[in-house]
């Protein structure tokens, strides 16, 4: 039997969904050097691939920024396998993954990604260093590569039995997916895609602008803050130097500026939101900006925007595999 999986290997967070399980976690893998030590005696789950050991760690790295080269790297394959291991029940799996609009339009890239991921892979997992490791054989039979916002469309239109909900296939949509690296826009007439558009703006820009702003604010005090201090969540309250710093006002200003850039990108796409029945904001960025995005009469922020794409990808895989 082949297990169907929906997977979003984003630079910010991994989202993986199967029929009865799902997981969300920061996409940060750290390769172990052999000198790791913890006073508690554990460093967490260890993943071994191609004779190298890794742990999930907030100070680790993802497979890259905005370059399409990341999809064909060993790091991206490893991120995929670690994600699949969170939900795997069957040895054979079929995946749907999403890519930004601009990468989706690159000639032959979808085929190259599928060929890179498909095949038999071996991942070893242990609860800690030096503990007995378990072998996971992951045979990726099929890989479907789609544009990222399509996941939310599938999640909204189909229920878990893959039935169309309330004739939702008869309406027109604009899906605005605010991710870590990119914002991607999908316009449809029913289930037929009218237009896709992508822009290199995302929560990464909020983080970078935020860190620059608070360093400028605190420069006279010789305090210094990094992306690790604010974390992927862009915390308004930062704890460092034994103190608590409240940067709520600064963060809100940065977010408001980003939303203005977002509005400019939507206009640049040439998509008139008033011509569509429903505008759906999705992705982790939509949740992060829910206080700043001013919703029109036909606009909503998807209720579970962080997982919407991955859940829709699982439905897409299930439809394709029958």
Each predicted region: which residue ranges?
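Glycine-rich phosphate-binding loop plus the immediately following alpha-helix
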Residues: 186-225, 229, 233
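Short, highly charged low-complexity linear segments
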Residues: 181, 185, 212-216, 318-322
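PRPP/pyrophosphate-binding module of the type I phosphoribosyltransferase fold
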Residues: 170-173, 178-180, 185-189
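Nucleotide/phosphate-binding catalytic cleft detector across ATP-hydrolyzing
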Residues: 1-173, 192-203, 235-322
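A glycine-rich, aromatic-flanked flexible loop/lid motif
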Residues: 179-183, 229-236, 284
